[in-house]
Amino acid sequence: MAARGRRAWLSMLLGLVLGFVLASRLVLPRASELKRVGPRRRPSPEGCRPGQEASQPGGARGDARGAQLWPQGSAAEGVPRDRNFLFVGVMTAQKYLQTRAVAAYRTWSKTIPGKVEFFSSEGSDTSIPIPVVPLRGVDDSYPPQKKSFMMLKYMHDHYLDKYEWFMRADDDVYIKGDRLESFLRSLNSSEPLFLGQTGLGTTEEMGKLALEPGENFCMGGPGVILSREVLRRMAPHIGKCLREMYTTHEDVEVGRCVRRFAGVQCVWSYEMQQLFYENYEQNKKGYIRDLHSSKIHRAITLHPNKNPPYQYRLHSYMLSRKIAELRHRTIQLHREIVLMSKYSSTEIQKEDLQLGIPPSFMRFQARQREEILEWEFLTGKYLYSATDGQPPRRGMDSAQREALDDIVMQVMEMINANAKTRGRIIDFKEIQYGYRRVNPMYGAEYILDLLLLYKKHKGKKMTVPVRRHAYLQQTFSKMQFVEHEELDAQELADRINQDSGSLSFLSNSLKKLVAFQLPGSKTEHKEPKEKKINILIPLSGRFDMFVRFMGNFEKTCLIPNLNVKLVILLFNSDSNPDKAKQVELMRDYRVKYPKADMQVLPVSGGFSRALALEVGSSQFNNESLLFFCDVDLVFTAEFLQRCRANTVLGQQIYFPIIFSQYDPKIVYSGKVPSDNHFAFTQKTGFWRNYGFGITCIYKGDLVRVGGFDVSIQGWGLEDVDLFNKVVQAGLKTFRSQEVGVVHIHHPVVCDPNLDPKQYKMCLGSKASTFGSTQQLAEMWLEKNDPSYSKGGSHGSARTA
């Protein structure tokens, strides 16, 4: 027993000694070597490996800059981005180097996992900050057959062993580098592959391209891709291909050369027509017009975009799509965090709880009738709303239409995600009807009834119309703030001080942010003088309203001595019985405030608001700020400051959405009305969303858009006409609810002699001023339903 125990101990000891010896001989030298060499690093974000030069032969300069436009994970998942993966040669000409070539270099070239060079004629300008390769012995003549072949020879001679794939592209194509990389990584570059959109020629060219039955070529416009093996086989024979050409089409001849010497031709695949997109629209103008299309999303290359602004437009759209995808990914991560926290018993952060709540129409539970979020009914063209202040039916504006198109497109992409494996495809036909609402806490919600076409292409082929209900939500992502310019605290404090209202106290705190002046500095800041506002009031009759307006003007402008000028555009017609009293009232105010800038300007003829404002504005120069006002309004000093801030000469016009009072006899049910005109409730009034008469505009911009249509008589239409002119002139319109202006209720009298359009608008305006829908309904029920009890449960149920 003792001998057996000693043998066991000796065996264990011998094993330990042998283990240490083997470790010292095998493991330690390897660890020392790794320590000397240092850790292997992944490619840097700019695409250059440690020790690798940024520039390559051929004139490329800084091709790795801007590679951070797309995330590193945008390639095939799990595969590091290889900057020596793809070489793109762009055919251009000297006359396009400053335009198309620069646009391509600044947009899609940054997404290519490799190198991009622009090939032009001999003697081309190489001082342009893009990688230009002037091809020796090549000119810019069209068709560019020699240029195309010599570019391929250049690729072969300089880069054959450095890149796996080679692409011939036009300068008016757009390439999605991340999508292209994912596609090419699924293929073997060691095999002879010739990729692009398969072409046979136009109907008129059939039989004239020297193509045998079954032969084809890759169309040059959307781009042509060659594997390294194809380029290796055909490049040595380029001279022979140049001498033996049968057509003037360079893409046909390149395809012929590849087929003859590489032994392959353009792949026969319907999918290539979608991946390499060519715009076949009738009357095409050289650019891709409709970006909100599934074709645009599926494509890898898009052609043509001959005008550089449209290239930048397309790139901006692609970046916005990428941002949307990243935002959606963040929402998914927040949801995963919330889900995992339930299993790990960890505390959920407030942000995760807000953004990670799963999709549901019950995310918000209303506790009162007023909190219920109502749905808007929609069809393909119109929105129907029961919201106070909104018309019962209105056409969809461009933003709403665009949003709906994007939603439908995303739905169809989800439905057809596995269409190939299922042997069917579903096409969208139209929206039968739907519902829409916006939850301010969580996002937009839709219920859509869709008419679709079910197309089965496996087994028994069939096409069947089907209807499907889609319940959709667009969740809000995290709020972000972006400062386009660095904040100047001193300038901001000065702008706040211009306002004599309650906000001026804020500037005292902001001044603490301003850098201290050096000792002995003589600099003294002077507050800029605020811009004078010229208030124009067309007036005919309405003396009582004029008295109230002048009382508000005195309190708001005259007593604080604000920098404004009041111009009363007084009509001299016999139909104005109050003319003498109005002139007398203005005289009294001028005596009381001799330094105030006030003027009465006579206007002849029958009343025309357009004519009066045109006459009044003619008194000012182009730098004057005009405020088109009415006598039945009251406004505050804060509004005047916003009038200045929201109106920019040559750029922006302010069309405030003002609050209009309901009839106080209905609102207060015969009781004494409140003296506070600025009470904003659903019961007291509504926002005039479709009124454009109250305007802040510079005289120069008024002249630029063509001024008022003085042929319009009476009230109405002149404001809509001016608004349309502003939009058509390309000026920005600023629209927002304005709490500093209130339209005081007064009886509306519609003259039957008005133009039919004006008369209809007048009747609509009159009907909207009686009271809110809920209050009018309650009044009707009180008179016609004896069982109705205001405020009771029965009444509440009936009016909800």
Swiss-Prot record:
Name its cellular compartments.
Answer: Golgi apparatus, Golgi stack membrane; Secreted
Gene Ontology molecular-function annotations: glucuronosyl-N-acetylgalactosaminyl-proteoglycan 4-beta-N-acetylgalactosaminyltransferase activity; glycosyltransferase activity; metal ion binding; N-acetylgalactosaminyl-proteoglycan 3-beta-glucuronosyltransferase activity
The free-text note explaining how the cofactor binds reads: Divalent metal cations. Highest activities are measured with Co(2+), Mn(2+) and Cd(2+).
Report membrane topology: Single-pass type II membrane protein
Q: Which residues lie on this side of the membrane: Cytoplasmic?
A: 1-7
| Co-factor requirement | Co(2+); Mn(2+); Cd(2+)
Disordered, as annotated region: 36-66
- The residues that carry sugar chains are N188, N622
- Mind listing the GO biological process terms from this record? bone morphogenesis; cartilage development; chondrocyte development; chondroitin sulfate proteoglycan biosynthetic process; negative regulation of ossification; positive regulation of smoothened signaling pathway; proximal/distal pattern formation; response to nutrient levels
Instruction: Return the GO cellular component terms, semicolon-separated.
Output: extracellular region; Golgi apparatus; Golgi cisterna membrane
The EC number on file is 2.4.1.175, 2.4.1.226
Which transformation does this protein catalyse, written as a reaction? 3-O-(beta-D-GlcA-(1->3)-beta-D-GalNAc-(1->4)-beta-D-GlcA-(1->3)-beta-D-Gal-(1->3)-beta-D-Gal-(1->4)-beta-D-Xyl)-L-seryl-[protein] + UDP-N-acetyl-alpha-D-galactosamine = 3-O-(beta-D-GalNAc-(1->4)-beta-D-GlcA-(1->3)-beta-D-GalNAc-(1->4)-beta-D-GlcA-(1->3)-beta-D-Gal-(1->3)-beta-D-Gal-(1->4)-beta-D-Xyl)-L-seryl-[protein] + UDP + H(+); 3-O-{beta-D-GlcA-(1->3)-[beta-D-GalNAc-(1->4)-beta-D-GlcA-(1->3)](n)-beta-D-GalNAc-(1->4)-beta-D-GlcA-(1->3)-beta-D-Gal-(1->3)-beta-D-Gal-(1->4)-beta-D-Xyl}-L-seryl-[protein] + UDP-N-acetyl-alpha-D-galactosamine = 3-O-{[beta-D-GalNAc-(1->4)-beta-D-GlcA-(1->3)](n+1)-beta-D-GalNAc-(1->4)-beta-D-GlcA-(1->3)-beta-D-Gal-(1->3)-beta-D-Gal-(1->4)-beta-D-Xyl}-L-seryl-[protein] + UDP + H(+); 3-O-(beta-D-GalNAc-(1->4)-beta-D-GlcA-(1->3)-beta-D-Gal-(1->3)-beta-D-Gal-(1->4)-beta-D-Xyl)-L-seryl-[protein] + UDP-alpha-D-glucuronate = 3-O-(beta-D-GlcA-(1->3)-beta-D-GalNAc-(1->4)-beta-D-GlcA-(1->3)-beta-D-Gal-(1->3)-beta-D-Gal-(1->4)-beta-D-Xyl)-L-seryl-[protein] + UDP + H(+); 3-O-{[beta-D-GalNAc-(1->4)-beta-D-GlcA-(1->3)](n)-beta-D-GalNAc-(1->4)-beta-D-GlcA-(1->3)-beta-D-Gal-(1->3)-beta-D-Gal-(1->4)-beta-D-Xyl}-L-seryl-[protein] + UDP-alpha-D-glucuronate = 3-O-{beta-D-GlcA-(1->3)-[beta-D-GalNAc-(1->4)-beta-D-GlcA-(1->3)](n)-beta-D-GalNAc-(1->4)-beta-D-GlcA-(1->3)-beta-D-Gal-(1->3)-beta-D-Gal-(1->4)-beta-D-Xyl}-L-seryl-[protein] + UDP + H(+)
Q: Which domain of life is it from?
A: Eukaryota
User: Which keywords does this chain's UniProt record carry?
Assistant: Glycoprotein, Golgi apparatus, Membrane, Metal-binding, Secreted, Signal-anchor, Transferase, Transmembrane, Transmembrane helix
Task: State what this protein does.
Answer: Has both beta-1,3-glucuronic acid and beta-1,4-N-acetylgalactosamine transferase activity. Transfers glucuronic acid (GlcUA) from UDP-GlcUA and N-acetylgalactosamine (GalNAc) from UDP-GalNAc to the non-reducing end of the elongating chondroitin polymer. Involved in the negative control of osteogenesis likely through the modulation of NOTCH signaling.
What is this protein called in UniProt?
Answer: Chondroitin sulfate synthase 1
Species, as recorded = Mus musculus
Q: Which gene encodes it?
A: Chsy1
